[in-house]
Amino acid sequence: MSARRALIILVLALAVLLVPWLAGSTAPTQHTIVVEASNFAYRPAEIRVNQGDRVVLEFTSADVVHGLSLDGYDLNLKAEPGHSARAEFVATAPGTFRFRCSVTCGPLHPFMIGQLSVAPNWPFWRAAALAVVVGVGALGYDGGRKTADGRQKMDEPPSSVFRRPSSWLRRLLRLRWPQWLLTVLLLAGFILAVLAGLLGTSVGNRNFAIVFVWIVWWGLLILVLVPFAGRLWCSVCPIPAPGEWLQRRALVTVSGKKLWTLGKRWPRRLRNIWLQNAGFLLLALFSLPLLTQPAITALVLLALLLLATGLSLVYERRVFCRYLCPVGGFVGLYATVAPLELRVRDPQVCASHTEKACYVGNASGYGCPWFVFPGSLTRNTPCGLCAECLRACPLDNVVINLRPFGADLMQERGWRLDETFKGLVMLTCAVLYSAVLLGPWGELKAAANAVMTPAWLGYALAFLALNALVVPGVFLGAVALSRWHERRTPGALRRAFVSYARVLIPLGLAAWTAFSLGLVLVNGSYALAALADPFGWGWNLLGLAHVPWTPLLTGLIPTLQALALIGGLAAAVGLAGHIAREQAGGQRAWSGALPVSLFCLGVTLVLLWLVMGP
Amino acid sequence: MKQEHLARLLLLVILVGLPVAVWAARAGLFAPPATAGERVIALIAAAPEGGGWQPETVRVALGERLRLRISGADVVHGFAIGQADIPPVTVEPGRVAEFVFTPPAPGRYTFYCTVWCSPNHWRMRGTLEVVGPDGVLPSPTPQPPLYQQLGLDIDAPHIAAHFPRNTPSAARGQALGLPLPGDLADPERLRRISPSAAFARLRADPAYAHLGDDQVWDLVALAWKRSTTPERLAQGQAIYTANCAACHGQSGRGDGPGGRALRRTDAMGVSQGPANFTEARTMAGGSAAIYQGKVLRGGMGTGMPYWGPILTEEQTWAVVDYLWTFLFDY
């Protein structure tokens, strides 16, 4: 990008952030607004006022005790039928502010949300304008220096984190027990979650199973582990551990025995992530009961454990992780973003090494449980970071590299249609969850929760149609526009579809980051009380049982979400330009990137509207 | 191999030890030894649709100090014992609340939910049976309430023959500077008559013949105000807010959210629902004795709960005193 162009983009970006709004200000008025709460919505769900207006809030409840805690204001009301509450405040800041129930009122309590819209909604319009400016800027970004063949050149080759063969980190990774110990501790947490889910209180936000699986684990996974360390979770995940121990007939050590399994081979036509796509969609259809009812969470966890263990006795290695785990599918896809990779130092060494200890195992390490030959590993997706190959390799050829974010996305080869759909499904689900779970529409939540009723069937059909048809269709349309000139070449569209689908990865990860920030910052404080009293039986293990629900950074959440979304858009559009150049054989081809970039911009604007829109 | 053995031991501790520890904790093995003379009773608080109080009946012996450990199963509930002067505890979902109570005498006590938790909230009641040292559960015959002593039919309609067009004001009545007749100055006697009857009584009295109808109503309001005290009105308001406002409305208009489900039109085309205490035509036609009777016995089939086992006699009079403030301006 030329310096002039960069300057223009920067000036435009600053302009949309700093230029004062020109709208004529309206004279402040007073609004008396009666908000009635009932499971699990506010009526009205949206309060609209102008900046500077005085709001008198009369808060009533129609069924049980509810609360109203307004983001960004020090305002927390409580009402019961027959006892209303009242508060007055001046809407000083413009923007959208969620209000949420602060008194546990039933299963969907954490998702009982309304919103105050203070016009003119500068934050939203600024964010939307910034998204457009950043999108346009990223579209023009030509990847900096290029090699002779037009391919993008990495700024630096991946650098191993092992400076020397005797690096302490390397020695640590070769030790077997630390990883095992961590897995076993997580297994203890897993068992506690299952026990709490089955025996403990049915109140989700007071049950260890719900709080530690869907808030703590989920937040850690999607906000920290996956973007920064890829599949690191998979390396200590307790779900496949018992099956793997049975296979190996050893816990920590390398037994040297043949794997104790029927050793069947996984059917060739299932060696992809279509089953993971289906499994994820199936669970997603029941997401509200799953996320709010401890017993259902416990049963799903138990089912996954049994499935993983059973499969390990029938099939070789970790079939469950690679081809079935509903979590593993998207973790593998988004792991391509992580700045961390396990690779071989020199592929030539592997090619000439006949023993292939990394794949078949030896006395120092088991053969790769993930069916991966490290010598040909080019992307993070299939590698579970279990480090068995690193232990087994007698030539010290396996290393952990630090690399730029999203390095895997820059390569053209290896992407498949099942992964394209994974990217589409994950993006669609992030948008739908942002609307259903964290939006102010009570009827939508009620329909999603009322499993097997006509309302739920309607919701499920719409959910599946959007996931499997609408969004893929729109994306396919965008790709088709990019490749209009070769619309008659057989197979070209499919190749381009799969190739452009890489933009869904930064876009989807950003969407999940935005969604999860809204979930985790608001509900994270439940973790302390759930740790002190995991079953809701009145325990007080660490003296934390009475820590009140404290939503964190509520005034900042929309800003953080917007930053994540715009960052994801910039990465996606930049990537679209890169893919367009690949498709055009290295020629500058921003017009080829335009339709897909517009798709990305559209999704980002929808998400911005969902998190901070008027 | 040593590593492997250690690992097996640790795994065994987790796979077996963790569930066993949870079971043991549940069974109370880690609980501090019970205090002598104290009995710990576990109670589940769930909305009536979810099972109500579990167990619904608790039987204990007199002399035991009871420590009730109440688990909230769904929404916010409250626990209190009827006719006992102990502040209620709030039972939050997924938490355990404690309520300590030493029954003062053998007999049946009603415990009940104090927080509106469902359209059937008032059905959330249980019985605490306290058995005397002789092993007997006494069932005393209480003094019949005033409406029974008077032989009143509290289900009969009580349309007022006279009722005020404007809200009568005790302050204006006071300003008239007229003495009230002795029968209207006696709180005990005032409970037996309706404002409508009191109005008729004054209207017929030549001593007040020079007054307009509104002024006579102001005198009625004055008589009613003098039959109570600010303390009793405050007590009545607290009871009304806690127990009645959900259906009858904070304003007394019968428009509380809890009453919506009760609103219906019967076969005769008469619309039914929580009483509107501000409607003078019906309110002025009833006496305190009738209203106390309705509070005590409830309205069979209308959704009005019975408060006899819950409120003390003093409390029922206090809440009836408060009801008049919807008709009169004190």
Segments (PLM) and residue ranges:
Chain B
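Extracellular/periplasmic metallocenter environments
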Residues: 8-10, 15-37, 92-165
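Beta-strand-rich interaction surfaces with strong enrichment in secreted/lumenal proteins
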Residues: 55-58, 86-90, 99-101
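Electron-transfer interface patches adjacent to heme c in soluble/periplasmic c-type cytochromes
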Residues: 163-166, 180-216, 246, 262-290, ...
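Sequence/structural segment immediately N-terminal to covalent heme-attachment motifs in c-type
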Residues: 61, 106, 162-182, 231-254, ...
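C-terminal capping alpha-helices of c-type cytochrome domains
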Residues: 207-232, 289-299, 308-330
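Electrostatic cytochrome c docking/interface patches
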Residues: 136-178, 213-239
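N-terminal edge beta-strand
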Residues: 35-65
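Detector for the c-type heme attachment site
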Residues: 117-118, 175-185, 203-207, 247-253, ...
